[in-house]
């Protein structure tokens, strides 16, 4: 699950009334890929057709909206997770690159003096361990949860370089990853369910 809170200050210009739009995110992703680094994307709703119009340079894309009638708003779980770790995204990205393809799960552990991302397969194992000098750790007890590597990797790889990531963790609970974009004008929160091993 992902939740984004974007203020108008994150945009070069912004004008809108209260409204609800249903978007096909795969189509939106395709439009965003058309933009080069630093290129401006203009997005506006065409009142005559009801479509969302994207302009990227000389390209114009008109996109049909999804009818949201009857769609339930996803409820974001309110979790009070025990451990909070603030770590540079570069450390997480190195750890993910190291553990990929070793096992079908990644273990995240944290204690008062450490944060660890590890993975153990049939023949190989690897871990990234950070102390309080490399990460800001806040927890009174040790916590541990396992997660599917492909989903966690996709989240971590999508976070821009130079970003500080707030990781909230507990025993066999979802992990929450929170980070800011656009000089703090936008906040992104990812929530990933744990992998629970059957006894």
Give the predicted meaning of each segment:
Residues 1-101, 109-199:
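DNA polymerase sliding clamps and clamp-related checkpoint/processivity subunits
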């Amino acid at each position: 699950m992902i939740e984004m809170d974007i203020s108008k200050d994150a945009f070069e210009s912004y004008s809108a009334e209260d409204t609800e739009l249903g978007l096909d995110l795969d189509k939106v992703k395709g439009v965003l890929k058309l933009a080069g680094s630093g290129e401006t994307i203009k997005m506006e709703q065409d009142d005559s057709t009801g479509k969302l119009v994207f302009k990227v340079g000389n390209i114009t894309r008109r996109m049909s909206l999804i009818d949201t009638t009857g769609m339930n708003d996803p409820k974001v779980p309110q979790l009070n997770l025990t451990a909070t770790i603030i770590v540079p995204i570069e450390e997480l990205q190195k750890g993910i690159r190291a553990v990929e393809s070793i096992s079908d799960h990644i273990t995240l552990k944290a204690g008062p003096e450490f944060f660890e991302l590890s993975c153990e397969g049939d023949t190989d194992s690897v871990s990234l361990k950070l102390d309080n000098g490399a990460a800001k750790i806040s927890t009174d007890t040790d916590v541990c949860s396992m997660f599917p590597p492909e989903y966690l990797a996709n989240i971590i790889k999508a976070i821009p370089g130079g970003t500080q990531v707030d990781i909230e963790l507990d025993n066999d609970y979802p992990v929450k990853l929170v980070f800011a974009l656009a000089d703090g004008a936008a906040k992104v929160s990812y929530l990933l369910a744990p992998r629970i091993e059957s006894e």
